[in-house]
Structure formats: C-alpha cells, structure tokens
C-alpha cells in the first residue's frame, strides 16, 4: 500500500481528511431546495380580486441591530448641551411603530451573513450553511423568490446582493441598479452608499414623469421596489455599532426612508403601497457578524401601509411580546410581534397578492395583516399548502431511491395524510370556523416542517456510523504505519489471507450496491472506501502492530512502571480533552501553559542546576503565553499595543545582531565570521529595518484611517513593499549561506515580523514574540532533557553490548516522544486560539487589511487574514523540524504521531455536533469540527514546510558531534549534555 512510505502516508492523510470534511456537507449542509412543486397563493373572490396592496417597498438596512434601531442615544455629533440628552435617532421609523403599522423583531439563523439573510427575507427559505461561501460574489439565487413571483421588481444597492436575485429570476423581471465596487471603501464615509441609493431612487421616479413606458410599468400591480442599504454594515465593521459613525448612519437611513416613502406616496397618491423595513443580520459589539450571537440574529422589522395592521396599543400597561431586549425602547405599550426571518417573504407575497415562493418555509405572520378572520384563515391554508407540497415532492424523490422507505409517521396514516387534512381545513372555513381553521393550518404547517426535517435528516444515522468507523479506521491505520516505520526495527510484510480479503471486498461491494440503488452522491463511495481500506490494512499488518506494542511497552513490567504508564496515559488524554474544551473556553490554554511552565522541575534538581537559564526562560515564556488567552478574543484597534509589539520584534532582532557571534561561535570559522559581518549582518540589518518601516507606515495608516482621511496612496504602496520584500528576504541569504539552526530560526522570525506588524490590530505582535521565544526554549529544553536522560541512562546501564547507532541513522520512537507530540499539539492549538476564537476569525476586524486594501475585496482581504493566521504555524513547523534533527528522530515521525492523535479531537467534535438548540450552539459545533479537520490536513502540510525550512541546517557543535559518534545505547542515539543549550 502507498501509505507504507512517508510520502504515501501524508498523501493519504490529506486525501482522507479533505474527503471526510465533505461529510459535514452531506449530513448537515444538504440543500433544502427541490423543484417540481405546484404554486399556491391566496384565492380571492371575484367580487374583490385585488390584493391588499398594489406594490411593496422593501428597505433592508444591512447590518442593523434591533436594539440600536429602537434605543435612545445622544446626538452622535453634538453641537450643544441639549444634544447630549438621549433621543431616538430614527424618529420616522419610530412613528410608523407608534401610529401606522406593526413592529417586532425578526430572528435570523446562522450564518448571519448577507446572502443567507437576503435569501431568507426574499425567498423564504434558509439556505444550507455552506451558502455563505457563495455570498461574496455573484451566484444566482436559482430558486423561487418574491421578486420572481412579482410582475416586476426594481432594486438599488450593492453589487454583491442585487445581481444574484436578478440573474436567478425570470429574464427581464428584475432590474438591478448597483454602484461600483470601488465605492465600498472602508476608509471612507459609508453613508455615501446609502445616499447613492436614495438619490438614484429619486432620479428613477423623476424619469417616470417623462418616460411613458416606465410610468405605465410602475403603475401595474404586484410591483416590488427593493432598497439595499449597505452603509450600516460597512460602518459597523469599521467603527463598531456603538460608535458615533454607526449611530449617525441610523439617522441617515431614517431620513432617507422618510423621503422615499413621501416620494412614492406623492407619485401614486392612492394609498395602495405597503412598506417593510428590516435587516439581513445584526452586528456584534466588535463590528462582526456571522455567528449566532443574539446581537447578530435579532433585527428590526417594521411594516406599514396598505394591508398592514395598525399598532396594537395597551395604554398604561406592558403590551404582550416584550422582554428584556426591548425594556429600554420606550415601546412597552405597543405590542411586539416577533417573527422568523423567512416569515417576511410570506408576508410580502400576501401583501401584493402573488403566489408564495415555491421553496418558502416561512409562516405568514397573521398579526401583521389588516384582514378579516376569514381572509386570514384562507391565507394560512395557502401557506400550509406550500409547505406540504414541498414535503410531497421530497418524499416522492426519497421513496424512489430507497429500498425500504420509512415515511414520516404523522403524515402517513390514512386519516392524517396531507390531502385529508387540507380538506378538513377547507370544510372548517366553509362552515365559518375560522379560528379553528387557522389553528389546524398552523398545526399542519408545524407537522409539514417536521416532515421536511425528517426527510432532510433521513440518512443521518447511517452516515454518522460510517464516518465514525472511518475515523477510527484512520487512527488505527495511522498507528500501524507509525509502528511499522518508526518503532519496529524490521517491519514484516503484510499478511493477507483469502478469507480476510474476501470479507473486506464483500463488505465494500455490499455498500456500493446500496449506494447505486439509492442513487447516492459520489462522495458516499469514498466515505465507504476509506474505512474498508484502513481496516483491511490494519488486519494485514497485525504482526507489526504486535511487535510495535512489544517494543514500546515490553519494558513495562513492574507494578510501579504500570502505574506510571497509566498515569501518563490518563494525563495525556486529559490534556487532549482540555484542548477540545479550549475551542469553547480559551482560558483552558492558560491553565495548560501554567502547568507546562513547571515541566523542567520534573527532571530533578540536578537538571535544573545544569540548565537554570534555559529552565527560567521556558518558565517565564510559558507564563507570558498564558496571559493571551485571558485577553479578549474580539479586539479593537490599539495603536500603542501594535507599536509595543513591533518594538519588541525590533529589540529581538537587534539583540541577535549584537550577540550573533556569541550564539554561533561554536560552529563558525574565522573566515566565515568575517564574511558574515559583511553579508549576513547586512541582510539581518535590512530585516530589522523593515520592521521599523512597517511600524512607521502602520502608525501613519492607522492614524489616517481613524481620522477618516482615507488611506494615503503612498502608505499603501510602502505597506505592500514592506510586506512583499520581507517575505522574499530569505532568498537573499543564498549570497552567504549560514547553516546554523539558530541563524535559520532568526531569519524566519525576522521574515514574518513585518507582516505581523502591518496586519495586527492589538496584542498579536506581543503574542508573536512570546510564541517565538517559547518555541525556541522548547526546542532547546527538549534536547537538553533528552541528552540529560540518555547520559543518566548510560551511566546506569549494566548491559555493555548495546547496539550501535551512527549519527546518520534515525533512532526509533520511544514512549518519551509522546510528550513532544503532546507539546506540539498544545502549541498548535495556541497558535490559533491565543489571539482569537471562532467568531473573531469568521468575522475578522477590517482595520488591519484596510491598511493594504481599503476597498471591499473579500477574497484578497481573506487571503491576508489567512497569511496572518498561518505564520505561527510556520514557526511551529520550523522549530519542530529543528528538534527532530537534534534528537535524531526521522523528519516525519512526530508529525505522524500528532496527525494520529489530533483526530481524537476531530472525532470528538464530530460526535458533539448539534442539529438542535440555539443557532449559536449548532453553528459553533459544526465550525469546531471543520477547524479540527483542517488542522489535521494542515499538520500534514506543515511536515513539508518544515522540511523546506530546515533543509541543510546544522544542529550540533563540533564537540557534540564527536561525542555523539562515539556514544552507544540500545535503540537510541545518545546526544551529549554539552551543547544542550
């Protein structure tokens, strides 16, 4: 098998994890969209054929939180003491709530991003979570929507939102007027985006006065106007939702809505227009969105105009619907009607009299309607028919591909089938039992939605079992490979039997046959292939497994040794479990670093005396690392902290320049030193200079952006120059190569330092320095411990005939190497979580990338974010590569052990994924699984990065090389104590 080699194993590891990451899409992210449904709308009597409204205007304040829309705040830009008195910043919208319409909170689902939010509002369905990846660029909404059902829709706003509804609708039905992407400049005043929309709407209606064709089209019924207002989202990202800029933007939106409403009412003069104001998602206090935090999922919903109910007032008392959220809105006497975001699409369809969107799952909010109880009953029935029609089509599709289909119980019995229920509701309406009909329709919608979920999750049990067996098989296979390559001295060939091969082949054929009959997706075949492959390989190499365990545990015979082994196993499993919990509670890493700081003390007083400085450096670097996970993960721009981090990087670089001869003196000849003074030191000085230049340009750019002066072009050019030049600097060292590992690590540190200055917004630069020092002290300390242990063992050895190992061979892995793998795992997790968490990564602050790319460009900005995230991982890979070489361990050995152990985390997160509960819990558990899976892939990639970083380095001084070549010990090369530091 290919996996029996190092390269083959890594290739299989990457392929397996990439394929199994896709399993999350086949389990949790299956698209709910089906085609072939009949359309349903409210059937109106011939004597009153008109819908409640002839036209509808939809305002979407992108990124507007519910609380900020209704709370009172001081004037954002006060000009007098009176302006400091809190007042409501959206008085016009507030007047709609108090006097003209119905209001509430629209609750979104995760991901709280623009595309999923607009799809829920306009199409009435919740796209699978993976749809967020398609929301940044034009991807048509290839399913039904309110716009598609309308006679015509005109829309104004962002080029990231409008085209996807235009291209996904019937050709010619939706007109989109979008500004250029260059206007989405995070360094400029984002209210210009909203002014652009309002001004172009005004120009549009003005043109209708002289354009007869346009005027005629505007006066048709079933017309929709969509105004997408992006200013609030852009301002929130740049300045946070509690900033004066965000609050001022609310005033701009409120005034603009007022002017557009008055314009439309003057143009038509018939009071036949309905208005809906809402948002696609909210905004966290840190200027981010994407996760399921309540600040992101709660958005305002205000509707007024033709067909909309007047406010339900309760003078002198607290009206129903209010809770702690709305306690400071001063709207306690007005009933609050909360809805799910998809319900808004059903509301809009009803108001203009179109069919409900075919894929809609929203439930019509009857409290928003100014209609008779009979009309509400008929509308509710039509709403239920939409959902049941989707169930019918989905069930038919599933029944056609399943050998033994099990229908959903509540919709399968003869007396309870959908057709019978609908007939019963119709009879209730005809009998005048409207309230009962509404209740039955609500119950039927609820059952229909449950049935849709049943079909959506029909294959979950089988897939979860298959994926679990696959991960267990991978871990067993990886363990077998590690034992064969790096523990067993003479690996045996696979021992396959005819019966065993027939069993595994029959199992694979049976699974594939079921997939063919069920018309399963192609990925299912790979999900089944890997576990069969892995377990067959483990079975074939069972002899190597037995020999490997004997080599590792054969010496554990005494009771004390068994107790020590059990204690270490429990301890290591506890640390791994702690790493899993650290995904949720970053503070756990603080505890692990504090515990790790005392590790040298476990080696005894003699070791501490010999390596006091190194032990103290490790102790204080661990304590420094422990502080970062106590700091806020969601950060705001802090220029002094950025400068402090850059200053520390500069200090480290200058210190190395001054002490370079002392650090490298044991491997360098006088001739080499002289050359280094003229070449290497010059390059080191340039790298330090780039850090200083990065600090200067970052300070200037950040100050200019904070003052809303935009990003100076010169700063942008210099910033890119520093970023690119610093990353290319290692190539210049080919002029005078220096193979000492300390010199190589110093180059890598200085190479990445300017990037961390330019792309940091707070304490990340300080973390970079502390993390680098921790890694270096870890490498030297592990080598010192290994040398100390081997020297001690050599003195106590009673067997003289030990097997010889030359410096050119790799020693086998031992149980003590599990500690190295465990430290590597902790450092790997801290590289990600010390400066952030899931939410801070998914919705990162724009201050850093706007210093290089001020205009909205998600892929380029995302690439810069990824660069910043992966730099600490590069540092880890380089240091582990050095450590492997110093210890005489094969380059891939520790990486492969970590790759195996990391999947304990992956499988744990797979098991705890939730599909019920709050959307924050659901989204977080899915994200945890995805990140754990990608980290496993990343570990495999880091092995090759490490090989590139440490190519040609020297890790031993001349004295230690001589000693090492003469040392002997069974199964291990014995490094000398001298040079351990």
Curated annotation (Swiss-Prot):
Lumenal-side stretches of the chain, per the record, are 28-464, 518-519, 582-587, 633-638, 703-708, 768-819, 884-892, 951-981
UniProt key word Membrane: yes
Membrane topology per the record? Multi-pass membrane protein
Q: What is its main location?
A: endoplasmic reticulum
Pfam families documented for this protein: Phosphodiest, PigN
Coiled-coil regions, chain positions: none
> What InterPro entries does the record tag this protein with?
Alkaline_phosphatase_core_sf, GPI_EtnP_transferase_1, GPI_EtnP_transferase_1_C, Phosphodiest/P_Trfase, PIGN_N
- Cite a GO CC annotation: endoplasmic reticulum membrane
GO molecular function terms attached to this record = mannose-ethanolamine phosphotransferase activity
Per UniProt, the keywords (alphabetical) are: Cell wall biogenesis/degradation, Endoplasmic reticulum, Glycoprotein, GPI-anchor biosynthesis, Membrane, Transferase, Transmembrane, Transmembrane helix
Give the EC number: 2.-.-.-
Where are the glycosylation sites? 148, 211, 295
Annotated pathway? Glycolipid biosynthesis; glycosylphosphatidylinositol-anchor biosynthesis
Q: What GO biological process, any one, is recorded here? A: cell wall organization
Q: Where are the transmembrane segments?
A: 7-27, 465-485, 497-517, 520-540, 561-581, 588-608, 612-632, 639-659, 682-702, 709-729, 745-767, 820-840, 863-883, 893-913, 930-950
Top-level taxon? Eukaryota
- The stretches that face the Cytoplasmic side, renumbered to this chain, are 1-6, 486-496, 541-560, 609-611, 660-681, 730-744, 841-862, 914-929
Q: Where in the cell is it found?
A: Endoplasmic reticulum membrane
Q: Does the keyword Membrane apply?
A: yes
Q: Which family does it belong to?
A: Belongs to the PIGG/PIGN/PIGO family. PIGN subfamily.
What this protein is reported to do is described as: Ethanolamine phosphate transferase involved in glycosylphosphatidylinositol-anchor biosynthesis. Transfers ethanolamine phosphate to the first alpha-1,4-linked mannose of the glycosylphosphatidylinositol precursor of GPI-anchor.
Q: What is this protein called?
A: GPI ethanolamine phosphate transferase 1
Q: From which source organism is this entry? A: Gibberella zeae (strain ATCC MYA-4620 / CBS 123657 / FGSC 9075 / NRRL 31084 / PH-1)
Its gene is MCD4
């Amino acid at each position: 098998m290919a996996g029996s080699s190092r390269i083959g194993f890594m290739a299989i590891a990457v392929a397996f994890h990439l394929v199994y990451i896709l399993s999350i899409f086949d389990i949790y992210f299956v698209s709910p969209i089906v085609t072939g449904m009949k359309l349903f709308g409210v059937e109106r009597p011939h004597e009153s054929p008109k819908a409640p409204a002839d036209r509808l205007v939809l305002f979407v304040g992108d990124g507007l939180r519910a609380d900020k829309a209704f709370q009172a705040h001081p004037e954002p830009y006060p000009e007098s003491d009176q302006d400091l008195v809190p007042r409501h910043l959206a008085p016009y919208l507030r007047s709609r709530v108090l006097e003209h319409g119905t209001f509430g909170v629209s609750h979104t689902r995760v991901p709280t991003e623009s595309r999923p939010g607009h799809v829920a509002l306009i199409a009435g369905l919740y796209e699978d979570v993976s749809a967020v990846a398609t929301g940044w660029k034009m991807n048509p909404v290839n399913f039904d929507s309110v716009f598609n059902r309308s006679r015509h829709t005109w829309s104004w706003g962002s080029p990231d939102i409008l085209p996807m509804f235009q291209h996904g609708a019937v050709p010619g039905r939706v007109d989109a007027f979008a500004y250029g992407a260059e206007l989405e400049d995070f360094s400029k005043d984002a209210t210009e985006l909203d002014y652009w929309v309002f001004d172009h709407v005004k120009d549009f209606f003005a043109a209708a006065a002289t354009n007869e064709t346009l005027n005629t089209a505007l006066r048709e019924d079933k017309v929709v106007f969509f105004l997408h207002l992006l200013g609030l989202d852009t301002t929130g990202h740049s300045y946070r939702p509690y900033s004066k800029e965000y609050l001022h933007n609310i005033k701009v939106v409120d005034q603009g809505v007022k002017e557009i409403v008055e314009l439309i009412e003057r143009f038509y003069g018939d009071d036949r227009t309905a208005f809906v104001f809402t948002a696609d998602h909210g905004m966290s206090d840190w200027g981010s969105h994407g996760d399921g935090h309540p600040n992101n999922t709660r958005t305002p919903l205000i509707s007024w105009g033709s067909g909309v109910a007047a406010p339900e007032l309760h003078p002198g008392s607290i009206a129903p619907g209010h809770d702690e959220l709305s306690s400071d809105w001063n709207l306690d006497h007005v009933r609050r009607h909360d809805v799910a975001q998809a319900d808004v699409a059903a509301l809009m369809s009803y108001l203009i009299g179109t069919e409900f969107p075919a894929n809609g799952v929203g439930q019509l909010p009857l409290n928003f309607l100014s209609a008779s109880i009979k009309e509400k009953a008929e509308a509710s029935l039509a709403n239920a028919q939409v959902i049941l029609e989707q169930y019918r089509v989905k069930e038919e599709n599933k029944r056609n591909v399943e050998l033994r289909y099990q229908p959903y119980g509540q919709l399968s019995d003869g007396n309870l089938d959908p057709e019978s229920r609908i007939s019963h509701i119709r009879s209730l309406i005809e009998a005048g039992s409207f309230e009962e009909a509404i209740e039955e329709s609500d119950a039927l919608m609820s059952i229909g939605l449950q049935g849709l979920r049943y079909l959506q999750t029909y294959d979950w049990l089988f897939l979860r079992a298959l994926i679990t067996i696959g991960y267990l098989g991978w871990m067993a296979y990886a363990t077998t490979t590690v034992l064969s390559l790096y523990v067993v001295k003479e690996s045996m060939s696979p021992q396959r039997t005819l019966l065993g091969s027939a069993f595994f082949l029959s199992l694979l054929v049976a699974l594939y046959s079921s997939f063919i009959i069920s018309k399963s997706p192609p990925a299912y075949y790979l999900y089944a292939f890997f576990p069969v492959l892995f377990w067959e390989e483990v079975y074939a190499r069972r002899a190597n497994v037995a020999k490997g365990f004997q080599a590792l545990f054969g010496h554990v015979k005494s009771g004390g040794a068994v107790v020590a082994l059990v204690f270490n196993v429990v301890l290591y499993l506890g640390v791994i479990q702690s790493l899993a919990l650290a995904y949720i509670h970053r503070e756990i890493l603080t505890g692990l670093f504090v515990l790790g700081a005392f590790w040298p003390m476990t080696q005894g007083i003699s070791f501490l005396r010999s390596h006091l400085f190194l032990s103290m450096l490790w102790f204080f670097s661990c304590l420094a690392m422990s502080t970062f996970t106590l700091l806020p993960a969601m950060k705001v721009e802090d220029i002094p902290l950025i400068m402090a981090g850059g200053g520390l990087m500069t200090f480290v670089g200058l210190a190395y320049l001054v002490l370079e001869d002392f650090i490298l003196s044991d491997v360098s000849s006088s001739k080499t030193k002289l050359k280094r003074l003229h070449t290497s030191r010059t390059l080191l000085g340039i790298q330090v200079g780039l850090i200083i230049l990065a600090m200067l340009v970052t300070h200037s750019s950040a100050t200019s952006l904070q003052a809303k002066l935009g990003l100076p072009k010169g700063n942008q050019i210099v910033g890119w120059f520093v970023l690119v030049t610093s990353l290319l600097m290692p190539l210049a060292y080919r002029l005078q190569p220096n193979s000492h590992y300390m010199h190589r690590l110093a180059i890598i540190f200085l190479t990445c330092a300017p990037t961390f200055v330019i792309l940091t917004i707070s304490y990340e630069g300080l973390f970079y320095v502390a993390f680098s020092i921790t890694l270096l002290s870890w490498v030297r300390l592990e080598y010192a411990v290994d040398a100390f242990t081997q020297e001690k063992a050599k003195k106590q050895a009673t067997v003289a005939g030990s097997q010889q190992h030359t410096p050119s061979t790799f020693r086998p892995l031992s149980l003590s190497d599990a500690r190295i793998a465990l430290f590597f795992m902790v450092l790997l997790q801290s590289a990600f979580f010390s400066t952030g968490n899931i939410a801070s990564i998914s919705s990162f602050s724009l201050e850093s990338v706007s210093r290089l790319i001020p205009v909205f460009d998600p892929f380029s900005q995302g690439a810069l974010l990824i660069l910043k995230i992966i730099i600490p991982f590069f540092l880890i890979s380089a240091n582990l590569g050095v450590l492997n070489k110093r210890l005489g361990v094969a380059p891939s050995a520790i990486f492969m052990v970590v790759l195996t152990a990391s999947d304990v985390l992956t499988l744990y997160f797979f098991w705890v994924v939730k599909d019920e509960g709050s959307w924050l819990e659901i989204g977080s558990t899915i994200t945890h699984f995805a990140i754990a899976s990608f980290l496993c892939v990343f570990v495999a990639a880091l092995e090759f990065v490490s090989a590139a970083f440490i190519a040609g380095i020297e890790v031993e001084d001349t004295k230690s090389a001589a000693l090492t070549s003469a040392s002997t010990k069974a199964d291990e090369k014995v490094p000398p104590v001298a040079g351990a530091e």
